[in-house]
Amino acid sequence: MTTSHMNGHVTEESDSEVKNVDLASPEEHQKHREMAVDCPGDLGTRMMPIRRSAQLERIRQQQEDMRRRREEEGKKQELDLNSSMRLKKLAQIPPKTGIDNPMFDTEEGIVLESPHYAVKILEIEDLFSSLKHIQHTLVDSQSQEDISLLLQLVQNKDFQNAFKIHNAITVHMNKASPPFPLISNAQDLAQEVQTVLKPVHHKEGQELTALLNTPHIQALLLAHDKVAEQEMQLEPITDERVYESIGQYGGETVKIVRIEKARDIPLGATVRNEMDSVIISRIVKGGAAEKSGLLHEGDEVLEINGIEIRGKDVNEVFDLLSDMHGTLTFVLIPSQQIKPPPAKETVIHVKAHFDYDPSDDPYVPCRELGLSFQKGDILHVISQEDPNWWQAYREGDEDNQPLAGLVPGKSFQQQREAMKQTIEEDKEPEKSGKLWCAKKNKKKRKKVLYNANKNDDYDNEEILTYEEMSLYHQPANRKRPIILIGPQNCGQNELRQRLMNKEKDRFASAVPHTTRSRRDQEVAGRDYHFVSRQAFEADIAAGKFIEHGEFEKNLYGTSIDSVRQVINSGKICLLSLRTQSLKTLRNSDLKPYIIFIAPPSQERLRALLAKEGKNPKPEELREIIEKTREMEQNNGHYFDTAIVNSDLDKAYQELLRLINKLDTEPQWVPSTWLR
C-alpha cells in the first residue's frame, strides 16, 4: 500500500529526542496530508478538497437556482407535449413487465448512467446573468468597478471562445470511463452456482440452472472471461523499456526495483509530495515493501510500471496504484540521507491508558493507517523507529490486520497532553473575591481511611499513556490475590462474602492488624494481629500496610505480610479495598488481580437496592454513578477487568469464571513485576 503523510506534526529532524508539536490549522495539515493507496478494505480514501469560501458558495447557489428554473420550464413544456391525444392513447397500452428479482443488487459504487444525471455545463448566458445579479446586489463602488470589468471580459469574443473550449473539455473529462472488470472467472462462478442449486427443487432455481446451461449464456461468459483477462493483465515492463525511460533522467543516480505484490497483500509504503516530487516517507510493517527490503524512506519515485510519477499529486498516485498487482517496477532516485543499518527491533507489548481515534487526530501522519484503540487494550508495538508514531497491532487483530497501524509514541502523547492541559488551565477563569483576592476553597475534605504515605498527588498529575506488559501464568501453589474495587452499595462486599462462605477451603481473608485490646473469644492471629501503637506506627513509616486508618482512637490496617501469609498457605486471598490503596498494593510483589465492580443503570441500581430493603434518594443514586465515573477515570489504569453488577447471581458466576481463568490462561501483567 502506498500512503501519504501529514508533515505538520513535527518541526525537528532528530530521532534522539521528542519532536515538537506544530499546532497548525487544518488547512495547513491538508497541504501536507499523505494519501493511503492500495489499502486493505475501506481505508484508502481520496483527499478531500478544502472548503470553498462563503462568497463562492453563494455564487454557486445562485447558478444552481437559475439552472433549476430552466429545468422546471423544460419539464413544463414536456408536460404540455405529453397532454396530446395521441400520447394519451399510447399511455393506455400496458407496459411490458419482467420478473422482479429481489436478489439482484447493484454493485456498490456502480452508478447507472442517465442523461438526467449528466454533468451540468455553465453557459455564457448563465455567467452573464450571474454577474448582473451580483452587480445589483453589491452596492459599494469598488465592487461595481470589479463587476463592470468582469462584464467587459465576458463580452469579449476571445473569452467566449475560450469558454466554449473549457465546456467542451469539461464534457469530455466527465465522460464515464469504460468499466473495469471485477473478475475473470465468470464461468467458474456459474459452475459453482449450478453446484449449489443441485439439491434445490424450487422452480426459480431450476430455471436459473437451465438458463446457465444454454449455449448463448455459456458463450457470453466465455467471451466475458477472455476480455476480462486481457483488460486485467498488466503489460509486462521489459528491461529495454525501463532503460529507455530512465535515459531522460541523465545526471541523476537512478535505481530500478521490482516487487512482486499479490492482490491481497498491500504494498505498505507511505508517500508525500515535495514540490513536484513523490517521496517515500514511511515503510509500514507487514507490507510487500517491508518484506522486500528494496524501498527506503526518502527515495523519490520517478516511474511505476512505465508511468511517470514526478509531477503527480498523492491523489493521482492513489488512483494509479489502487488496482495494481503482480510485478511492480519502480524507477527511483535513492535517498541521500545516510542512515545506520536498522537494528533488529524487539516487539514490546503495552497496555493503553487512554482512548485514541485517528479520525479525530489532526496530527496523525496518515489517517488511513491510524490504529484506533480504547483504554485497557493491549497493543503489540513492532516498530519505534519513528519516536513520535509507533507501528503496532491490536491484541486479537493480528490475523485480520495485514498492515501495522500508527499509534502516538509515548513521549509524543505525553508532550501534547501536557500542552493540552496547559491550554485548558490558561482558559480557566480565576475565582474572584473581595478586594481582587481569590476566594479560598472552604469545602471540607472528608476523612478516609487509607495509606497516606507516598502522596498520590503525583499520580493525579502524571500523564498516563502506555504501560509495558508481559504474559504471566500464576503457579499452582502461589495464587494471585483478588482485589474487589467499587463504590459503596455496588455489591463487592456481598460477592466477597459469598465466595468466602461457599469455598472456605479455597478462599481466605488477610488477618488485619489493630492496636485495640483483645476481646473475649478473639484469637490472636485468627481475628486480628494485636500490636502496640508504637509498633503499628513504625510499620506505617516502613510502608508495610496496604491501607490503614483510625477508629475510636484505635488503629486498624491490612498489611502486605498478612496477604503474603494467605498466599503462602496456597489459598486465594480476597480483599475489598479503597482505590487509594491500589498504588501501594500494585508496587508490592503480590501481583494482585484487580476487578472493578461497577453499578448498572440508575433505575436498575434502585431496583437492586430495593430488594435489599434500601430506599436510596435520587441524589444518592446519582452520587454512586458519578463516583463510578470518577474511580474509572482516576484509577482505571489499575484495573485488570470489570464486572457490571446488574444481577448478583450473574455477577458471582462471572467473578468465579474470571478467577478460574487465572489457573488456565496466562494474563497480561506489568513487565516490572517480572524483572
Swiss-Prot record:
Keyword Signal applies: no
PROSITE patterns, per the entry: GUANYLATE_KINASE_1, GUANYLATE_KINASE_2, L27, PDZ, SH3
Residues modified as Phosphoserine: 14, 25, 83-84
Chain ranges passing through the membrane: none
InterPro entries referenced in this protein's UniProt entry, alphabetically: GK/Ca_channel_bsu, Guanylate_kin-like_dom, Guanylate_kinase_CS, L27_C, L27_dom, L27_dom_sf, L27_N, MAGUK
Keyword Phosphoprotein among record annotations: yes
Guanylate kinase-like domain ranges (all copies): 479-660
CDD domains named in the record: GMPK, PDZ_MPP5-like, SH3_MPP5
Positions contributing to ATP binding: 486-493
Region (Required for the correct localization of PALS1 and PATJ at cell-cell contacts and the normal formation of tight junctions and adherens junctions), start-end ranges: 1-345
Tissues showing expression: Expressed at the outer limiting membrane in the retina (at protein level). Expressed in T lymphocytes (at protein level). Expressed in the kidney (at protein level).
Function comment: Plays a role in tight junction biogenesis and in the establishment of cell polarity in epithelial cells. Also involved in adherens junction biogenesis by ensuring correct localization of the exocyst complex protein EXOC4/SEC8 which allows trafficking of adherens junction structural component CDH1 to the cell surface. Plays a role through its interaction with CDH5 in vascular lumen formation and endothelial membrane polarity. Required during embryonic and postnatal retinal development.
Family membership: Belongs to the MAGUK family.
Protein name: Protein PALS1
Gene designation: PALS1
